[in-house]
A protein has these predicted regions:
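Alpha-helical protein-protein interaction modules
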Residues: 8, 94-111, 115-252
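Acidic, proline/glycine-rich low-complexity intrinsically disordered segments
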Residues: 1-109, 113-130, 136, 164-166, ...
Length: 252
């Protein structure tokens, strides 16, 4: 329950509950995988006092989950997500592909495999999986809206360079994340002109929410291959849209 709820308190309660499950059965592959997933989420949101220690713990639980049952699709799904966040891109695709082969109609693995493919390998194939995930399970477990599904499709169409569809899916999102907002702004600039971006409603709506964003870090955490144009184009665009203005104080 707690691992699909948002917030630091739920994150820590989820870890506590999963620890109890592991104490009961050390070979519980799903519990090890879910603990790794929970730690990965908390790490990304800055919940921990010693984040590196927690990430090492998460990686250890990924290893234990695979040793316990590599034929559990959830184990493969979570292993794929962790591998991609560690920039182990080929390993991420392998885990997602295996998870999909085990259970090809589960929306959780469809979302993971689709996300993996659009960012790293085969955009068209990935989009098929993302659309199927939306049709099978419009509001994912623990969510109140379809925002995460729309988010995945907006980024997927950015990866396809279908900028109109990136914008149209992005406009459906109620709770916008910084990375998706950036891909939508980039798409607006390609559909029109970069000088028109700040006139668009979606820019005005979220401008204040993301004015303190570290864009280099945000793009890094989207987990594209660093040499890929999907990554470098966003870096160049963010530098033009949000230049780092350094104020040099005059000395007497």
């Amino acid at each position: 329950y707690h691992h699909v709820r948002s917030g630091k308190e739920n994150n820590l309660k989820a870890i506590e509950a999963l620890d109890k499950a592991i104490e009961t059965d050390e070979t519980n592959a799903r519990a090890h995988a879910l603990k790794a997933c929970t730690i990965g989420g908390g790490y990304g949101k800055g919940y921990y006092e010693d984040p590196d220690k927690m990430m090492d713990m998460g990686l250890e639980h990924v290893k234990k989950s695979l040793e316990a049952d590599e034929n559990d699709f959830e184990v493969q799904r979570i292993s794929s997500a962790i591998a991609q966040s560690n920039k182990e891109f080929n390993k991420s695709i392998e885990h997602a592909k295996k998870g999909h082969s085990i259970n090809p109609n589960d929306p959780r693995i469809l979302d993971r495999y689709g996300t993996c493919l659009v960012k790293l390998d085969n955009v068209d194939e990935g989009l098929k999986h993302l659309h199927l995930a939306l049709s099978l399970d419009p509001i994912p477990q623990g969510a109140a809206t379809s925002c995460s599904r729309y988010d995945a499709l907006a980024i997927g169409y950015y990866c396809k360079e279908d900028f109109e569809k990136c914008i149209s899916w992005g406009e459906k999102i109620q709770y916008m994340g910084a990375s998706t907002w950036l891909t939508i702004l980039y798409s607006i600039s390609k559909n029109d002109d970069i000088s028109k971006v700040k006139e668009h409603n979606i820019y005005k709506k979220y401008e204040n929410d993301f004015k303190e964003t570290n864009w280099e870090k945000t793009i890094h955490n989207m987990h594209f291959r660093p040499e890929d144009s999907k990554h470098t184009n966003l870096l160049e665009f963010s530098n033009k849209m949000f230049p780092n203005i350094k104020i040099v104080e005059k000395t007497a």
